[in-house]
Curated annotation (Swiss-Prot):
Gene it is expressed from: asd
Sites of Pyruvic acid (Ser) modification: 183
Compartments, record wording: Cell membrane
GO CC terms in record: plasma membrane
Catalyzed reactions per annotation: archaetidylserine + H(+) = archaetidylethanolamine + CO2
Residue ranges that the Swiss-Prot or TrEMBL entry lists as coiled coil: none
MF terms in GO: phosphatidylserine decarboxylase activity
Enzyme class: lyase
Family named by the database record: Belongs to the phosphatidylserine decarboxylase family. PSD-A subfamily.
Name of the protein in its database record: Putative archaetidylserine decarboxylase proenzyme
Protein purpose: Catalyzes the formation of archaetidylethanolamine (PtdEtn) from archaetidylserine (PtdSer).
Organism field: Methanothermobacter thermautotrophicus (strain ATCC 29096 / DSM 1053 / JCM 10044 / NBRC 100330 / Delta H)
The protein's assembly and partners: Heterodimer of a large membrane-associated beta subunit and a small pyruvoyl-containing alpha subunit.
InterPro entries hit by this protein: PS_Dcarbxylase, PSD-A
Amino acid sequence: MLPKRASFLVSVATIPLLFGYHAIGILMFTVIAFMMQFFRDPDRIPPSDEDLIIAPADGRRLSGKIDRIERVGSDYPLIDRIFPDGSGGILISTFMSPFDVHVNRAPVSGKVIYTEHVDGRFQVARSRVLTENEKNLIVIKTDYGNVGVIQIAGFVARRIVQYVKEGEYVERGDRIGMIRFGSRVDLVLPENCEVLVKTGSRPMAGETVVARFNPGKKRVNVQ
């Protein structure tokens, strides 16, 4: 069943058809279908194990996928806001195509201790644009360490929306923001996490397990 707002828009789009303006009616239906596809926000069910880390972004349609998994040092942009002690972390970067769900979700449960919006350019998000593109950082404190989610704008995606504020507690899988018309989301984890996905994986935000907290392990090999 269509949401009430969508049903209303469909009803409006039928008016030109009733008066013989078929081209206008078809155009309106096309625009409405696109907006419904883009702004869809399906429910997701996260796993129950508290040590699991889930994908913050979708990467399932067409070119959407996890395209970077690597260890990053203390010189990586914004990482000092995530790990103030100067340590490095593990980066899992997901490219979102314009056809993916664009709502971003909390990868872990914890307290939002820091957020920062950084103005910048709007280059294609496939390149290494973290230093230049507009971005938004959300840092979540957990019992296992801090986790950072970096929403990055791109050539098409020119608006980042943040749903949470500093001081709020989020549950894993909660909606924390949105990037309109695709782009990329970088997930930065503590070094002792165990990565459970590979480059090329196609995650589902709020459900796909991408890593596991492993506080007893000092170092994890990342390929």
